Swiss-Prot record:
One of its GO terms (biological process) is protein import. The gene is secA. Its EC number is 7.4.2.8. The lineage of its organism: Bacteria, Bacillati, Bacillota, Bacilli, Lactobacillales. This is Protein translocase subunit SecA. Pfam families: P-loop_SecA (PF21090), SEC-C (PF02810), SecA_DEAD (PF07517), SecA_PP_bind (PF01043), SecA_SW (PF07516). Monomer and homodimer. Part of the essential Sec protein translocation apparatus which comprises SecA, SecYEG and auxiliary proteins SecDF. Other proteins may also be involved. It is a peripheral membrane protein. It comes from Streptococcus gordonii (strain Challis / ATCC 35105 / BCRC 15272 / CH1 / DL1 / V288).
């Protein structure tokens, strides 16, 4: 172990020596750049662009380009990047993560690699965690980029598609991570190429990279549409039932936060819902409602996991930032279960049209880098998942903050009493205090305690984060006391007021340890910026969430052995600090394993998504007649159906093929059984294909010109693909839940998921081709007048696709349809899985 650590330290030292040499080369250009006039310095941008076009690489331009940005920053912003900031910039350009402490000027550091990479003309995305930081950084740093001749765009959720397109077309685009993800998904749902807003993803520089790529890695971005729902009553019934249970009726596993009914709970459920067997296959849907109601009532906690807004809506609280996540909803019916629990209106369920996780979104960029003050603890995950190294950058000035050892108390009451005393003492002498909590509930509780003690203070949590920046900016003033949920206000520096340095600087107090050491380090890092004095102190209790879940029994036994009173039994020991850190490492390990497993599942979806989106993009951007592609789909659909019936008895086979042809390919009266008799399978395929092409040509002839034909083909294919893809996403979600249960039968759930989803994907492709064929042949196309606007082309083309619904024709004899044949209704499913099931 010691050898491994030594190797890591030596590698870091070697990397830093290399970075120092490169930074010195940039600094060597300082006098040369300082001698240039403003116009000459600005002209460097066009010169660099030309040199890049002529074959020089960005690496070749690095030293001069960085020197130009340094000089530009001095003239425009009055800031001159330090050598350590140049080193950080080089790491960012190489597609890695420089670990830079709070207050070391990460925003200014980013200007150098952003400028350099923007010279290529392919777009640079600077990604932040919220829109306040997006606008702030784009406004402050945009002044420098504009002065140097680069365009800067700001991408906000409220902007129109035209404004977003303009923002993405700029050399540099500032945006939140979620907005880039949603724009990507929406771009892959449009019908016309000109409605897309993004360019291909080139280079992303992610601020607070650990928050986005680690903490939110599992969060799927979902674009969904409402599904008509008659299940609201079931949510309320399940909620009423669950609220009637006693503690003995359900079992909670605290470490994994899972819950289920005990035997007595199952008996009560069967009695309540008048069932013989709750776990009969017919009651699967009901057990899902009960499970969600259990989670909502006994796992999800008001003001910790979610809050109820003034508009009577359930808003999710981000566990890492303490902010409410506007527009986000728990999936799979859990959000509705919480709505029923809290007595607010239950909203309809939605169906996912498109989704992607941040892990897969950011892995699509050609180059990815990011900045944070705390990434070293997650180095393995950055390397394994994103192929990114973490390189610690030294501080410009030595850190002067004093980090006190943790204080451990037996109860929450004694802990908070000590916190209030400490805050009061520091407040009286004028030292500013920032108190970090892990939940909204704790903030409110502590706030009441401080009010009772007569200590004026500000509270920053999920309920008022719109005042976030203002509160944080004042947190370093003399006598200021600020309570902040977790890492709310991250990205905004706390500057010390007059006379505060002499009082010891900002004191950060943590009221409990977070699951992740990194989050604790972020809280500590709010104090002692750029060599300022400061202090940090964590107060813990045996009743804290982390201590309850992981190993507080041994510590409690020690306290009991000494028989200390509440006031006396405060422990300050390195041994206990190490135990707490060991518990944190265990949780971090569990979370990493979970994220790795999620990625294994999500990679399957990623591969399939990329195929569908690539095909979709090809259709949207095609400036040609798509007849060859549609002809191929028609041929494959015919071949599949005939091959699928090849082993059936001759009479049964021909009947099935005739029904298929009549109701999916050609006019009913144009074909009869005698046309198929005496032909081999290959001859039947050829005959049907020939007839289908005649129908295709007659359909196309009804359209007024080549432009209308192309529009019709595109809308037809895209409409089918989008509907089938939406259904496929839903099916994959259900499959994922199902294979999780197969793990109990000694099968590897990931392998099962991969093989099953591959089969489902192939079925979906067949189903897409079947529907395109059926719609093409059976669409009622009317002679069109020339539309007045381009928009009308899409609506007219869409309106023309009005084929019959997938209902069975009245004269179909179900007895003659084989179980494994395609259902004659045209759904694309096998008969046994469609009308044969009824």
């Amino acid at each position: 172990m010691a050898n491994i650590l030594r190797t890591i330290i030596e590698n870091d030292k070697g990397e830093l020596r290399k970075l120092e040499k490169m930074a010195n080369k940039v600094i060597a250009y300082s006098d040369q750049m300082a001698a240039l006039s403003d116009e000459e310095l600005k002209a460097k941008t066009d010169e660099f662009k030309q040199r890049y076009q002529n074959g020089e690489s960005l690496d070749d331009l690095l030293y001069e380009a960085f020197a130009v940005v340094r000089e530009g920053a001095k003239r425009v912003l009055g800031l001159y990047p330090y050598p350590v900031q140049i080193m950080g910039g080089i790491v960012l350009h190489h597609g890695d993560v420089p670990e830079m402490r709070t207050g070391e000027g990460k925003t200014l550091t980013a200007t150098m690699p952003v400028y350099l990479n923007a010279l290529a003309g392919e777009g640079v995305h600077v990604v932040t965690v919220n829109e306040y930081l997006t606008e702030r950084d784009a406004t402050e740093m945009g002044e420098l980029y504009s002065w140097l001749g680069l365009s800067v765009g700001i991408n906000l959720a409220a902007k129109s598609p035209a404004e977003k397109r303009e923002a993405y077309a700029c050399d540099i685009t500032y945006s939140t991570n979620s907005e880039i993800g949603f724009d990507y998904l929406r771009d892959n749902m449009v019908v016309r190429a000109e409605n897309m807003v993004q360019r291909p993803l080139n280079y992303a520089l992610v601020d607070e990279v650990d928050s986005i790529l680690i903490d939110e890695a599992r969060t799927p971005l979902i674009v969904s549409g409402p599904v008509s729902s008659e299940t609201n009553q079931l949510y309320h019934m399940a909620d009423s039932f669950v609220k009637s249970l006693n503690k003995d009726d359900y079992i909670i596993d605290v470490p994994s936060k899972t819950i289920g009914l005990s035997d007595s709970g199952i008996d009560k459920a069967e009695s309540y819902f008048k069932l013989d067997n709750l776990y009969d296959i017919e009651n699967v849907a009901l057990t899902h409602f009960i499970d969600n109601a259990l989670r909502a009532n006994y796992i999800m906690i008001l003001d910790i996991d979610y809050v109820v807004s003034e508009e009577q809506e359930i808003l999710i609280v981000d566990q890492f930032t303490g902010r409410t996540m506007e527009g986000r909803r728990y999936s799979d019916g859990l959000h509705q279960a919480i709505e029923a629990k809290e007595g607010v209106p239950v909203q309809d369920e939605t169906k996912t049209s498109a989704s992607i996780t941040y892990q897969n979104l950011f892995r699509m960029y050609k180059k990815l880098s990011g900045m944070t003050g705390t990434a070293k603890t997650e180095e393995e995950e950055f390397r394994e998942t994103y192929n990114i190294r973490v390189i610690p950058i030294p501080t410009n000035r030595p850190i002067a903050r004093i980090d006190h050892e943790d204080l451990l108390y037996p109860s929450l009451e004694s802990k908070f009493k000590a916190v209030v005393e400490d805050v009061k003492e520091r407040h009286l002498k004028g030292q500013p205090v920032l108190v970090g909590t892990v939940a909204v509930e704790t903030s409110d509780y502590l706030s009441k305690k401080l009010v009772a003690a007569g200590i004026p203070h500000e509270v920053l949590n999920a309920k008022n984060h719109y005042r976030e920046a203002q509160i944080i900016m004042n947190a370093g003033q003399r006598g200021a006391v600020t309570i902040a949920t977790n890492m709310a206000g991250r990205g905004t520096d706390i500057k010390l007021g007059e006379g505060v340095r002499e009082l010891g600087g900002l004191c950060v107090i943590g009221t409990e340890r977070h699951e992740s050491r990194r989050i604790d380090n972020q809280l500590r890092g709010r104090s002692g910026r750029q060599g300022d004095p400061g202090e940090s102190q964590f107060y813990l209790s045996l009743e804290d969430e982390l201590m309850r879940r992981f190993g507080s029994e041994r510590i409690k036994a020690v306290l009991d052995r000494f028989k200390l009173s509440e006031e006396e039994s405060v422990i300050k020991s390195k041994m206990f600090t190490r135990q707490v850190e060991a518990a944190q490492k265990r949780v971090e390990g569990n979370n990493y394993d979970t994220r790795k497993q999620v990625l294994q599942y999500d990679d399957v979806m990623r591969e399939q998504r990329e195929i569908i989106y690539a095909e979709r993009h090809d259709v949207i951007t095609a400036n040609r007649d798509l007849a060859p592609e549609i002809h191929a789909m028609i041929k494959r659909t015919i071949d599949r159906f005939v091959d699928g019936n090849s082993r059936a008895p001759q009479e049964e086979k021909l009947d099935s093929i005739l029904y298929f042809a009549k109701y999916n390919l050609v006019p009913e009266e144009s074909i009869s059984l005698s046309d198929l008799q005496g032909l081999s399978d290959e001859e039947i395929k050829a005959s049907l294909y020939e007839r289908a092409l005649e129908v295709y040509n007659s359909q196309i002839a009804k359209l007024r010109d080549e432009e209308a034909v192309r529009e019709f083909q595109k809308v037809l294919i895209l409409r089918v693909v989008d509907n089938k893809w939406t259904d496929h996403i839903d099916a994959l979600d259900q499959l994922r839940n199902a294979v999780g249960l197969r793990g109990y039968a000694q099968n590897n759930p990931v392998v099962e998921y991969q093989s099953e989803s591959f089969r489902m994907f192939n079925d979906m492709i067949g189903s897409i081709e079947f529907d395109v064929t059926r719609l093409m042949m059976k669409a009622q196309i009317h002679e069109q007048e020339r539309p007045r606007t381009e928009h009308n082309i899409v609506t007219t083309a869409t309106r023309n696709i009005s084929a019959q619904e997938s209902d069975l024709p009245a004269d179909v004899d179900l007895a003659k349809v084989g179980r494994n044949e395609l259902c004659p209704c045209g759904s694309g499913k096998k008969f046994k899985n469609c009308h044969g099931r009824r």
